[in-house]
Structures are given as structure tokens and as C-alpha cells.
Amino acid sequence: MTKENIKLFSEMHAEPSWLADLRQKAFDKIETLELPVIERVKFHRWNLGDGTITESEPSANVPDFTALDNHLKLVQVGTQTVFEQTPVELAEQGVVFTDFHSALEEIPELIEEFFMSSVKYDDDKLAAYHTAYFNSGAVLYIPDNVEIKEPIEGIFYQDSDSDVPFNKHIMIIAGKNSKISYLERLESRGEGNAKATANITVEVIARSGAQVKFAAIDRLGENVTAYISRRGKLGNDASIDWAIGVMNEGNVVADFDSDLIGNGSHADLKVVALSSGRQVQGIDTRVTNYGCNSIGNILQHGVILEKATLTFNGIGHIIKGAKGADAQQESRVLMLSDQARSDANPILLIDENDVTAGHAASIGQVDPEDMYYLMSRGLDKATAERLVVRGFLGSVIVEIPVKEVRDEMIATIEEKLSKR
């Protein structure tokens, strides 16, 4: 794939010159930059991008939309948007939820201001690749002082019959003092077995006083090798409450970051992960405290089955000048197989004195006494293990603020465990 192909893609979609030029600059950087560092995860030989910027054809793997609640929703299959729903009262308040290129026409100044602002195009090789080659996406914009009580859904299906790269850029711009609850699904759909790559970047911009509840359930298929980056950038007194279920079937590296720029900003990152088969999942979860009295909490629990690998890196970094900041983290992994591999790495970087910080990490097998107790009550081994896993992950799931997300995450865990 040459720069000319990327230029043609920009022209075909009538992209503004600033974006077309940025794609070209990013392309030039790809070969000179290193891959991001995910400690103790060897992914340098993975195929995380084949250098194409094609679009998918309309798919037969399209869900039925005959019975839907009337709330804000967008659904894409591959690069195609197959459903958009914006209630009239929200549209009248200036709320926008649409595909990326439509948003470039509707709110061009905001896209130019915030696109690739929480992650820079030249941060690393995968960021540059994403900027040059992303082929679809979505934008959610909530104006200042708008509060949406109903959950907002962004559903992004990867077509299992297609080898078109699943390279999406998703932006959420939450205006000052706005309040939303957003649920995102990344999911392979269909019975196909085409091999594909995914490079997904999600930027959440929480402006001063904004409150964002962001939940995600990732269920990409075993033939999808993925890099998933979710980045939050928080203004004064803004908050993002992340709840992410990493339930993919293929090899995945993920980077979940929150930059607490504003004074009094607050980010909670709750991550639940399940690895099975021979898959490798490596997850970096980072909170960086820039603002005074900013608070960042990381809570992540994972379960490993069979010969899988799961790595948690929890990183708390308090920048010089962030007086009164607090960074706490906990990473725990439960192994249900003696052939599984795991790491849980707590990392604290403290550049300021007047702060508080702490960490905890553990890796362990299922407690034999727990299993004995449950099986002595008449449960078979598989059912007993499922209950132990539910209890282990439940301490994180119970902290998720949206009931529908809790229920769906539990159902997803049950589904994965039942395949054993």
C-alpha cells in the first residue's frame, strides 16, 4: 500500500486537507517508529496491520432492528453504518452520534480540535499506522450542560467472513458539565473464518465538569489479531468511570489510559478479562495524574483457562506538580490450568511528594478448599469452577454502575466458560 492509495481514500471521502495531510505524515513515520511497549508481552511478530485501507462490502451478517428502545444508538458492520438512531429531543439539543465522515461534515471544527489529541499520531508505530490507515469510525458529541439519562450504545461488528482490516477511530466529546452513560461493543459476527487485523482507537474527551460512564464488552473472534487503545483526557473536575470486559477469542494487546489533566479530575478503570485456548492477551492500564487533587483508581481481575496467557500491567504515574493526587491499583489473576501463563505487574512512578499511592497484585490457582466445599454440596467440577470464577470476577463486576452492563458481562463470562 502506497501513500497514493491513502491519498485516494482521503479524496474519495472528501476529507479536509488537515486530515489528509496528517494521514500522509503518519504514513511517513510508520517505518521509523517502534512498537509500543507492553511489558512482558511478546507481540512483535504479530500481524497487526497489512497496510491496506479498503472498505468492506455490505454484509449479510446484519442484525435485526425491528424491536429497539428509542435511545441513542449507532451500529456498524465492518466499515458500513447499518443503523443510526437519535431521538428528536436529543438532536434538538445539539447531540450528534454518527459515522466519522458524516461527523466531519456536521461538526468539523470539533473533529479537527480533538482528533488524535489524547494519543499523538507519532507516539509509536501502531498510533502512526492507525492514523494513516483507519477506514471507519464514529463520533459522539454531547454539548455543554446536556444530561442524557438513557444509555447510549455504539455497536461495532467485525464481519467474520471479511478480511478487511477492522481499523476504527471512535471519538466521544463530552461538553462541560455534561453527563452520559455509554456502552460499546466490539464483536465478531457470523460463522466465517477469514483472518483479519484490528487497530482500534477510542478517544474520550471529558471537558470540565463532565461525567462519563464508559462500559465496553470486547468479543472479537479467534481469527482477529487486535490492538485496542482507549484513551481518556479529563478537564477540571471531570470524571470517567471505565468498565471494560476483555472477552476476545484471538490474540490482543490493549492499552487503556486516562490522563487526569484537570485539577480535581477522577478516573476509575475496572477491567475484567478472560483468556482461553492458546490465546495471548496483554493489557496495559494506566492512569497519569497531572492535575492537583486528581484521583486515579485501577481495579482489574482476570481468569485464565487451558494454555492461554494473560498479562496485566497496572501503571500509576503522578507527575511533578500534581499535589494532593491519589493513585491506587489492584491487579489479580486466577489460573484454572497449570499450563496457563500470567503476569500481574504493578508499576508506580511518583514525581511529587505530597501525594498518596498504593498497589496490590496477585496470581493464584483456584483454592482447593473452595472447590471441595462446593463439590461436597453436590456440584460437579465444571459448575463449581464457574461459581468460583463468578465470585472472583464479581468483586469487579459489582462495581460497574450500569445494571445492563453487569448482566451482559456475566452472560458473556458464562458463555465462555461453558465452551470448555
Question: Predicted regions span which residues?
Answer:
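N-terminal amphipathic, basic helical "cap/leader" segment at the start of enzyme domains
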Residues: 1-128, 305
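Short, conserved phosphate-binding/catalytic loop or strand-edge motifs used
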Residues: 390
